[in-house]
Amino acid sequence: MYASLMDVGQTLAARLADSDGNGANDSGLLATGQGLEQEQEGLALDMGHNASADGGIVPYVPVLDRPETYIVTVLYTLIFIVGVLGNGTLVIIFFRHRSMRNIPNTYILSLALADLLVILVCVPVATIVYTQESWPFERNMCRISEFFKDISIGVSVFTLTALSGERYCAIVNPLRKLQTKPLTVFTAVMIWILAILLGMPSVLFSDIKSYPVFTATGNMTIEVCSPFRDPEYAKFMVAGKALVYYLLPLSIIGALYIMMAKRLHMSARNMPGEQQSMQSRTQARARLHVARMVVAFVVVFFICFFPYHVFELWYHFYPTAEEDFDEFWNVLRIVGFCTSFLNSCVNPVALYCVSGVFRQHFNRYLCCICVKRQPHLRQHSTATGMMDNTSVMSMRRSTYVGGTAGNLRASLHRNSNHGVGGAGGGVGGGVGSGRVGSFHRQDSMPLQHGNAHGGGAGGGSSGLGAGGRTAAVSEKSFINRYESGVMRY
């Protein structure tokens, strides 16, 4: 897959960059325009003269003599370990904890499965090939490796787009009918089917190509795994992947988050002053933290694949790419392929940083740290990453609940002032309790009807001042229980 960092020539390494699917695609081969003859389909290369840029003969550098061989191998090993542990833990958390099986976490599970696919299949193959002079496997392994890599990329980017769309709907219309879990599962399955269909060209056209090369001890033939059958097909596939897997999803996700930001800004401006201080600090923060989790995944994905797409587009479409190929572009090329694999292991790391719930589960499963379950952690930090079902309900109804709480507080406060005499106390307590009971029935909050109505009855029959005291106690206890229940709903 990669060329030598130190001794690469200007033309042949760029020409062999077509075969960037797996491990030894160019293997540090050295040559320039002189002595390079390409047939109609670019399959037969005469490399009897490996010349440097000034025309001197440069011997082929064996794989084990290149420093990047060891650097990339160590990096791939770390990617494999971190990716298996992180994504494997995500899968375990989802299936072992029922409270984690909600809509956003279903998409996160799909991301983890796609990352595990490329880590368990493609990363070991790339690691082995990078230490070999030639492609060591059969043709089927070449096709499978390229196929799984394309599936993983497709599932990742399409899932991030779907997750961003789900967040947009939840923020713009928090009172909408909640998306059902079967519909979410259906969407995730369709994403996998679409990714498989888009990856089929890799199965059909990936093949092993042979290139003769001149060495200090004589001529040898190097086999590489190439996903492109010819230069024109390579241009079509590079442009198509950059559009479908990168530019188009980035545009859609960017538009969704711009509209989300405008909506949240307008909601904050239109909120009354008394409600603004309460709601903007609690419920709006919950929605923003969930959006921050999605943004973290999106930023990681597009940063990791940016060098890869930049190099591929430059090489295949820039007219003088072969002549301009130098150490900078070679390093960028190696970095691009490494970061594309790195993307498969950094999602759990990003989730660990932004989610208190996942951090708690991760420590329990992998670090053998005894973490106590703290209710306040589940009420507040769950909205920042992997969320339980109660946090999702809270985010989607936060606008309605917060506004009603402010009105209810004012209503209860006014009613409590009526408890001056015996008759007035009864009316005040009864009205206050009636409003509490009515709101409870409408939004299904876990409060006790009997206590509220009992307070009203007691206020009406207890005599001087009883109604006012009952209403005041009812207001305080209800508001406390209500505000704590908002984050659990």
From Swiss-Prot:
Can you tell me which residues are glycosylated? Answer: 25, 50, 219
Which Gene3D superfamilies does the UniProt entry name for this protein? Answer: Rhodopsin 7-helix transmembrane proteins
Molecular functions per Gene Ontology: neuropeptide receptor activity
Entry keyword Transmembrane:
yes
Chief subcellular site?
Answer: membrane
Q: Listed disulfide bonds for this chain?
A: 142-225
BP terms from Gene Ontology = G protein-coupled receptor signaling pathway; neuropeptide signaling pathway
| Ranges of compositional bias, category Gly residues | 452-468
Where is this protein localized, as stated in its record?
Cell membrane
Outline which residue ranges sit on the Cytoplasmic face.
96-107, 165-184, 257-293, 355-489
Q: Which PROSITE patterns match?
A: G_PROTEIN_RECEP_F1_2
Tissue-specific expression: Highly expressed in larval brain. Also highly expressed in adult brain with very low levels in larval and adult gut.
The record's note on what follows loss of this gene reads: Reduced levels of insulin-like peptide Ilp5 mRNA, reduced secretion of Ilp2 and Ilp5 proteins in mid-L3 larvae, growth defects and developmental delay during larval stages.
Question: Which GO CC annotations does the UniProt entry carry?
Answer: membrane; plasma membrane
The UniProt keyword set, sorted, is: Cell membrane, Disulfide bond, G-protein coupled receptor, Glycoprotein, Membrane, Receptor, Transducer, Transmembrane, Transmembrane helix
What family is this protein classified in? Belongs to the G-protein coupled receptor 1 family.
PANTHER family registered for this protein in UniProt: LEUCOKININ RECEPTOR-RELATED, NEUROPEPTIDE CCHAMIDE-2 RECEPTOR
Give the function comment from the record: Receptor for the neuropeptide CCHamide-2.
Q: What is this protein called?
A: Neuropeptide CCHamide-2 receptor
Species this chain originates from? Drosophila melanogaster
